[in-house]
């Protein structure tokens, strides 16, 4: 444990930020899973709606650095391709 006051403060701030980021990361994963679940169920309308809800959230979190921009782009690209391939 830190002895210096500023180091203690940084440790508290870091833990607070870690919990906040974990919550946000979990939210992003949940939105992505909803789209995959709709695709697996074969429901194109639901998949499209879930994707439209997911996209701005993934973009926002990638712009804030929570997830890498390439990872966000990869998820969106894969999901759009799967939705378009549905009948």
Curated annotation (Swiss-Prot):
Binds directly to 16S ribosomal RNA. It comes from Yersinia enterocolitica serotype O:8 / biotype 1B (strain NCTC 13174 / 8081). It comes from the Bacteria. Keywords: Ribonucleoprotein, Ribosomal protein, RNA-binding, rRNA-binding. InterPro entries: Ribosomal_bS20 (IPR002583), Ribosomal_bS20_sf (IPR036510). This is Small ribosomal subunit protein bS20. Belongs to the bacterial ribosomal protein bS20 family. GO terms for biological process: translation. One of its GO terms (cellular component) is small ribosomal subunit. PANTHER family: 30S RIBOSOMAL PROTEIN S20 (PTHR33398), SMALL RIBOSOMAL SUBUNIT PROTEIN BS20C (PTHR33398:SF1). It holds the Pfam family Ribosomal_S20p. The keyword ATP-binding does not apply. Residues 1-26 are annotated as: Disordered.
């Amino acid at each position: 444990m830190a002895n210096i006051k500023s180091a203690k403060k940084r440790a508290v701030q870091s833990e607070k930020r870690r919990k906040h980021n974990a919550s946000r990361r979990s939210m992003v994963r949940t939105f992505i899973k909803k789209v995959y679940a709709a695709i697996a169920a074969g429901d194109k309308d639901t998949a499209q709606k879930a994707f439209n809800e997911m996209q701005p959230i993934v973009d926002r979190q990638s712009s804030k650095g929570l997830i890498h921009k390439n990872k966000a782009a990869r998820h969106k690209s894969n999901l759009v391709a799967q939705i378009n391939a549905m009948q």
